[in-house]
C-alpha cells in the first residue's frame, strides 16, 4: 500500500543543482525539506547497477541515519551511439571536481570518433529514478525519461550537469536555455519536459496528491 509523505523530508543529495531542483518541485506541497548536506550525513557508495538501485541506496542510507523519510534521485544521460554511456556513471564522468564541461567535451569527442554528426546519430535520453524511503524500511519508487538529441557546442547557462547539450524532443532550445518553469513544469505551465519533473509527477500521485 502506498504511503503519503508528511512532516519533514530529507533530500538525500549533496549536489547543489539537484537539491535546488528537488526543493523547487516539493515547494507547492508544503513539505519541510532538509538536505543530507545540512544534516552532515555521509554520502553512501553508489554500488547499484541501475538508476533505481542507486536511488534506493541513497534514500535508505539517509532515512536510517536521520530517522526521517528521505527522498533521493539518481539520474543520468544515456547516449545511444555510446551504447548508453555515461548512464549510471554520468556524475563520475565529471569527476570529483564536477567538471561537466569536460564530461560534455568527452562525449562530443567520442561521438565525433564514431562519425555521429547528424542529429539522428546523436539521440540520447535523460533518466531520473526517484525513491522515498522511511526509517521502518518502506519505500516508494518511480522512474521516468526525457528523450532528445545532443548539440554542440553547449548552449545556455541554466540548469546543471549535461543540460547545455541536451535538446529535448520537439523543442529548439536546450535544457540549459530553459527557465526552471519551462523545464520542470512549475505553475502556470503544468507538467514540464524534464526527466526529473516527469518522475516527480508520478511520485506526487502516490505520495503527495490529495
Swiss-Prot record:
User: Top EC class per UniProt?
Assistant: hydrolase
- Catalytic activity, reaction form: XTP + H2O = XMP + diphosphate + H(+); dITP + H2O = dIMP + diphosphate + H(+); ITP + H2O = IMP + diphosphate + H(+)
Chain residues that bind substrate: 13-18, 75, 160-163, 183, 195-196
Q: What is its EC number?
A: 3.6.1.66
Organism superkingdom: Bacteria
Which GO terms of type biological process are on file? nucleotide metabolic process; purine nucleoside triphosphate catabolic process
Q: Spell out the subunit comment.
A: Homodimer.
Q: What does this protein do?
A: Pyrophosphatase that catalyzes the hydrolysis of nucleoside triphosphates to their monophosphate derivatives, with a high preference for the non-canonical purine nucleotides XTP (xanthosine triphosphate), dITP (deoxyinosine triphosphate) and ITP. Seems to function as a house-cleaning enzyme that removes non-canonical purine nucleotides from the nucleotide pool, thus preventing their incorporation into DNA/RNA and avoiding chromosomal lesions.
Q: Which family does it belong to?
A: Belongs to the HAM1 NTPase family.
Q: What is this protein called?
A: dITP/XTP pyrophosphatase
Amino acid at each position: 500500500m502506498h504511503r503519503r509523505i508528511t512532516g519533514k523530508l530529507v533530500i538525500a543529495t549533496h549536489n547543489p543543482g539537484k537539491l535546488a531542483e528537488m526543493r523547487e518541485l516539493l515547494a507547492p506541497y508544503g513539505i519541510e525539506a532538509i538536505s543530507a548536506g545540512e544534516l552532515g550525513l555521509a554520502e553512501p557508495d553508489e554500488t547499484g547497477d541501475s538508476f533505481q538501485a542507486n536511488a534506493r541506496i541513497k534514500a535508505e542510507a539517509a532515512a536510517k541515519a536521520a530517522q526521517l523519510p528521505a527522498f533521493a534521485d539518481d539520474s543520468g544521460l544515456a547516449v545511444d551511439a555510446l551504447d548508453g554511456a555515461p548512464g549510471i556513471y554520468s556524475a563520475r564522468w565529471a569527476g570529483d571536481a564536477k567538471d561537466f564541461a569536460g564530461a560534455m567535451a568527452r562525449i562530443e569527442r567520442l561521438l565525433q570518433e564514431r562519425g555521429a554528426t547528424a542529429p539522428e546519430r546523436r539521440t540520447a535520453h535523460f533518466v531520473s529514478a526517484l525513491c522515498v524511503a522511511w526509517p521502518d524500511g518502506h519505500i516508494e519508487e518511480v522512474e521516468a525519461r526525457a528523450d532528445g538529441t545532443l548539440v554542440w557546442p553547449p548552449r545556455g547557462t541554466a540548469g546543471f550537469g549535461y543540460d547545455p547539450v541536451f535538446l529535448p524532443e520537439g523543442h529548439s532550445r536546450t535544457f540549459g536555455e530553459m527557465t526552471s518553469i519551462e523545464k520542470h513544469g512549475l505553475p502556470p505551465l503544468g507538467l514540464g519536459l524534464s526527466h526529473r519533473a516527469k518522475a516527480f509527477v508520478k511520485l506526487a500521485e502516490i505520495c503527495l496528491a490529495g
